[in-house]
C-alpha cells in the first residue's frame, strides 16, 4: 500500500501522480567505475520521519532503501533470493519460516546483525505505537511470534499461512534496523534509522534534505551486484523540492544530478538531450486507476460500471493527454506484477453501442435537456475526486477531461471534483470513498507492491475489515479465490487463482485502469550505475558513480 495506500496507500495517497509511460528499464552506461564524489538527488518529501517502519510511505523508503538491507532480495524476474538471510525453510503447513542469517554483517553502529536483531525488528511490527501502515496491513494479521533459536537462526511463527510473505520481506518497508536505534525511542529513531546498508544518515532536516555518507565497512550487497564492497560515492544529498518545474531546472543547471518523477512535459526533451538520461520502470502492484465506490447508486449497478468502462475511451483519452508518451494499462494488476493476466489488455475497448445497451438494461433510458441519461427523473452522474497537489500534472487533468467528454457522448455526467489531501485521508481513515460527501470515485489511485495479493486487500471482505477496500465491494466467490491464493505455495495453482481473480475484478468493473505506475528518474549523463529495484520500484544508489 505502499499507495501504498497503499500503504501505501497513503503513499498513493490517491493523489494524481506523474508516474507512467515508457516501460523499458534502463540503466546508465557503464565503463570503469570511479570512486568518490557527492551526488545530489531531488526526491519527494519524506515527512518528519525517515524510519520506514513508522507510517510507511514511498518517500520514506526511497531514503531508507539506501540505508537498510532486507532479509531477502527480489530480482527483476520476481524471484526471491538470499540477502541478510542466506537460506530459509518453510514448514509443510506454511506456518513456520526458519531463517539462517549471515554471521559476518554488522550495523553501522557496530552492533551485530543477528537473530536477536531481526527478532526485535519483527516484534516491533506488532507494537501499535509504531503505526506502520505497511506492516499493519501485511504482517500484523499473520505474525504470531518470533524465536531466536540460535545466534544466527530465527524462527517466525504465523497465525495462518501466507504465501507472499517472502516477497513482502523484500520490500524496504521492513528493512532491518539496529535494535540499539530502537532503544533511543520512536522519535529519535525517526531521525536516524541505523542499518547495515551502503550508506548511513549524516543529518536529516525535515522538509529540506537528508545527507548520507558512505558505510566504508559495507559487505552485504544484494544479489547480482557488480560491486562487492563499499559504495562508489562518498556521500549523497537528497533534497526535497516540491515543485517539479524547479526540480527540472535544477537538473538543467547542474544543481541536481538526479531528479525523481520529472514532469511528463519534459520527457521528450530529456530523451533528446545528449547530457541527460531518463530511466523508467513499471512498478508492480496496480496501475494508476480510477477507483470506484460501488456501495451507492449509481455505481452499485455493475451494468453502469461496465458502461462507464466501455464509454470512457481511456485509450484515446490517454493518448491525447500525454501525446503518445504514456502506455495504457488495462487490467487490475500492473503488467510488472507476477501472475499478470495478459488478456486484460483487450478489456473494455471503446464501444459506445455496448455501453448504451447496458445502460438501457439498467433502466437509464430517459434523457434530460443536457443530453444526460436519466432514470426516474434522476440524472446519471458520478463525482470523481482528484488532486492538483504534489506530483499531479496538467496531462493527468487533461486525461480526466477527455474521459469526461467521451462519457458525455454516452449520456453519463462525470463531475470532476478537485479535492484536498484532507479529504482523501478522510476516505482512507474511514475505509470508504463514499465517506466523503459527494464522491464516488478517486482518480490516480495506485498501490505499488510486489505481490498480486494486493487484489485481496483492495477488493475483498478482508480489505473491508482492514479498511483497505475503499470501493466497498464484497463478493463471497472472489473472497474465496483470493483467500485460497494467499495460502497456496504451489506456483502454478496460485497463478491460476490470481488469473481467475483478475478476470472477476475486471468483469465487475471495480476500477477504471489508466496507465502504469512507473518509477521515472531523470539524471545527468555523467551519472552511471543508477538502477531501480523490482520489489517497489525504488532508486538504487549503491553502485552509482560519477564520471570525472
Residue spans of the language-model regions?
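A structural "hinge/loop" feature
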Residues: 43-62, 84-86, 111, 164-174, ...
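Gly/Pro-rich hinge or "lid" segments in bacterial periplasmic/extracellular proteins
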Residues: 170-237, 352-353, 357
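N-terminal lobe/hinge region of extracytoplasmic solute-binding protein
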Residues: 42-92, 123, 194
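Structural transition elements
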Residues: 199, 293, 328-368, 389-398
